[in-house]
């Protein structure tokens, strides 16, 4: 990586990546992506034998193998925050050994160009922001890496929507990737997923404050619609048994949902929980970005224009390990098992056992850490083999 583009560890930088042309032929002028970098000095680092796989510490950050992390739908580039148990010195993704990068996705609202960003005419893009595919996001990230001087990704890791980007990266730019790890994702959106996700979009679009997507200069925010979308989405991120065990049919403290008439202020405990999740998202995320990114998930299909899903997976040349969660109702485990049966260079699968559902990759730190350790150990072996083969060829 060009050291001129390397921010301080834990900090971010926003760079212009030029125009991005979508699959559908729409140009996003002078797009920007914001990215975070994580790296630490090995001085004084304790031995962490359980997760010891990786290059020897001591290389300067820009010389280290690069781990590129792809965040999920409403995530951001600050991977050491939302994946704090996984990213850091002497953690599974060891920042004393690797240079870890994570970019905010195109279409988002965390510093990269999206619907809330200024159009060249000075107004917000709003409804003029084009529909995106997962491939468009990868195109933007590829332009970012080219801009900052990255030519090789040692390990590509992503979950949920990030996992979809991992799969597309592997098919679009296999020459750049040493090894890949998609987590809790599928090869394409299922009809069930599209139904769930499009229903969330409809709630936002039905909010009077949406104004057809052009609400940015109105002083209004479609917070009700975004909150309703989050309530639906959050249930799909958790496990059914876990939610029932936590809340059951208990009323919220001080409220009585068993009264003679329906009263929205008299809630079950689970309703209060979902209301709180909605409030938190509304406070930090843009409804326009939520629509664009959720629509991109609906469009996800690795088989489109590649001869079908299985043919596309079979053509994948990147050594790929897969992780799934046994209680995931958003991306059920059978979808990761399908990946494992059809990927062209499949190198293993790990199953996270958890009552917490899709969010298990965030919650089950011990199991996720073990899976990452296995993957990064495999990535090292692959890299050593590649270097050996290249040396033999040169000889």
From Swiss-Prot:
Group of enzyme by EC: transferase
Q: What is its main location?
A: cytoplasm
Gene Ontology CC: cytoplasm
What catalytic reaction does the record list? L-homoserine + acetyl-CoA = O-acetyl-L-homoserine + CoA
* An individual GO BP term: methionine biosynthetic process
HAMAP family (alphabetical): MetX_acyltransf (MF_00296)
- Please give the pathway this protein is involved in: Amino-acid biosynthesis; L-methionine biosynthesis via de novo pathway; O-acetyl-L-homoserine from L-homoserine: step 1/1
Q: Know the name of this protein?
A: Homoserine O-acetyltransferase
Q: Which organism is it from?
A: Corynebacterium jeikeium (strain K411)
Xref: InterPro entries: AB_hydrolase_1 (IPR000073), AB_hydrolase_fold (IPR029058), HAT_MetX-like (IPR008220)
